[in-house]
Amino acid sequence: MRNILYVQIIFILIIAFVTPIKSYAFNVAKHISNVNGLTNNSVNCILEDAEHTIWIGTWDGLNAYNGREITTFRYSKNNPNSISNNVIRQIIECKGSLWIATDNGVNRLDKRTRQITRYYLRTDNKVPNQEKSFILGKSAAGDIICLIKGLGFFVYNDSEDEFNPINTDFASH
């Protein structure tokens, strides 16, 4: 009887010590840098999306890390479907897209197609003549809202695929 008790105690101790080792054996941190594909080592923002891709905004482009490889997105003046600027300030996720604030506008990246759309948030839809500060957020209803220094608040209208200004008294002060 006593031997059975000892065997049970030893069995419980073995399970208690082996289980944590097994469960943590696959959690390996990997260092990524410009040596293995990151566009720049100076990171401005990081987001893990719903599919567990890590999006890294740097001073020299946007990077997507899926656990195996890094895909980069950079500005190209000859490609209107490229990101609007290489300085990535903020990344948020909403309704299957990533919204990216750069020093030269807001961009939407469709994660499924990897198509990028630029939004300059001006009435003439041209590139701003100077860098602006863009801050992105989501409303309680899931709308994308953008605050632009010197211009005020804008809300994204999905049906028109554009940002519309929000009239507020304090935005112009």
Each model region followed by its residue ranges:
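Carboxylate-rich, polar loop motifs that coordinate divalent cations or form catalytic acidic clusters
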Residues: 1-173
